[in-house]
A protein has these predicted regions:
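Feature captures hydrophobic
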Residues: 1-133, 150, 154-156, 162, ...
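Conserved class I S-adenosyl-L-methionine
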Residues: 172-179
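Conserved SAM-binding loop of SAM-dependent methyltransferases across substrates and taxa
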Residues: 184-193
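Conserved SAM-binding strand-loop segment of SAM-dependent methyltransferases
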Residues: 216-228
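A short glycine-rich, Lys/Arg-flanked "PGG" loop and its adjoining helix->strand segment in the class I
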Residues: 259-271
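Substrate-binding/catalytic lobe of Class I Rossmann-like enzymes that use SAM or dcSAM, i.e.
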Residues: 280-389, 393-395
Length: 395
């Protein structure tokens, strides 16, 4: 019978990864207990062992890319812990309104200083648009610039502008931003297109800084769960908006709440408005996320599939356009890590070494996941009744 080390070495060989090797994908093991930990706890054990310094990778993103591209995660993913997590998600609503603020406290309230150091100048915490075409609508500040983007700042500006163009944003439009973050898109939409925005977030720290960054602009920031916007009543339509955007928030909604989410969006959107949903997606339907990500980064988060979204919008929306630029998230995450790593000498006064290894593992393992095309980034444009004459796609 093969030892735990021999079993892991045989698996890694399928991904062309060598223990003790010198290539970017190779790893060094500092604690022999690693092998049993990974076999017993799967991806959770692998991530926690990295945080504990039990192993190191010459290039963590390259290693994870190799492992996922070779499908090695499937060889160790089903264990008692993951089975219990799946059962828990099936029987309970892990993203209920009572738990809605958990992710805000656990992730987005870590400290604005961390995100200011890691992100672009506008503090956009979603995928940048690096593959922006060199030509486009001359009405767009970004599309008419005549060049591809090269920096994180440019990629995020291109993404913000892409969202504005896809919903046909114009002066005077009032927009609901579900999961507004630090108000990045709201500020851009107001300054570049003359819109007004209501942004909602479950993070108190995000809301405080968003209000500061958007001071003096027609932007209202609310600390509010999406289910509290325009509640269903017998009193008519309630609060409605010309358009709705939701950038990087749907991953926190949870499968059991997808119908509720789109029901709320349907009630909030005017009859001729457009709703742009920007979300990370997965190629198969699932009820839970990676156990390490669930425990340390996004509690209660889960990535939707195309099938789950399609089923959830039935009767509420017409899908006008689906745009996948998931490969751009790899580039975005690598840029975020470069910024975070460069700022670490300053940040380490507030965070310990284990946090550094956790955050590094988060950013680089996700980069590897997008590089392996395990995860996608979708921008989906929805209308309530179909755009008369058809929707014109924007890239």
């Amino acid at each position: 019978m093969a030892s735990a080390r021999e079993f892991c070495e045989a698996l890694l060989k399928k991904a062309d990864v060598k223990i003790g090797g010198e290539r970017p994908q190779d790893i060094a093991v500092h604690d022999e207990r690693l092998y049993n930990r990974v076999i017993r706890y799967g991806t959770l054990g692998l991530g926690e062992a990295y945080m504990d310094g039990w192993w190191e990778a010459n290039a963590l993103d390259v290693f994870i890319h190799r492992v996922l591209a070779a499908r090695l995660d499937k060889a160790i993913e089903i264990n008692v812990a993951s089975m219990l997590a799946i059962a828990k998600a099936f029987f309970f609503n892990l993203q209920s309104s009572k738990r809605a603020f958990t992710v805000g406290e656990a992730h987005y309230d870590l400290g604005n200083d961390l995100y200011a150091a890691m992100l672009d100048k506008r503090m956009v915490y979603t995928c940048g648009y690096w593959s922006s075409p060199s030509t486009g609508s001359t009405s767009s500040p970004q599309a008419s610039s005549g060049h591809r983007v090269n920096t994180l700042d440019e990629a995020q500006d291109a993404k913000l502008d892409l969202v504005c163009r896809k919903i046909g944003l114009k002066k005077g439009d009032r927009v609901l931003d579900i999961g507004c973050g630090w108000g990045s898109w709201a500020k851009y939409a107001v300054e570049k297109y003359g819109a007004s925005v209501v942004g909602i977030t479950v993070s108190k720290e995000q809301a405080a800084l968003a209000r500061e960054l958007c001071a003096g602009l027609p932007v209202e920031i609310r600390v509010q769960d999406y289910r509290e916007v325009n509640p269903s009543t017998m009193l008519g339509a309630g609060e409605q908006f010309d358009h709705i955007v939701s950038l990087g928030m749907f991953e926190h909604v949870g499968v059991k709440n997808y119908r509720t989410y789109f029901d709320v969006a349907n009630r909030c959107l005017k009859e001729n408005g457009l709703f742009l949903l920007h979300t990370i997606g997965y190629k198969v339907s699932q009820l839970t996320s990676d156990p390490w990500i669930e425990k340390y980064i996004f509690p209660g988060g889960v990535l939707p599939s195309v099938a789950q979204i399609g089923k959830a919008i039935e009767g509420f929306f017409v899908m006008e356009d689906l745009h996948n630029f998931g490969a751009d998230y790899d580039t975005t995450l690598m840029a975020w890590f470069a910024n975070f790593d460069a700022a670490w000498p300053r940040l380490k006064k507030q965070y310990d070494e284990r946090f550094y290894r956790m955050w590094k593992y988060y950013l680089l393992s996700c980069a590897g996941g997008f590089r392996a095309r395990q995860m996608q980034l979708w921008q989906i444009v929805l209308s309530k009744n179909g755009v008369p004459g058809g929707y014109t796609s924007h890239r």
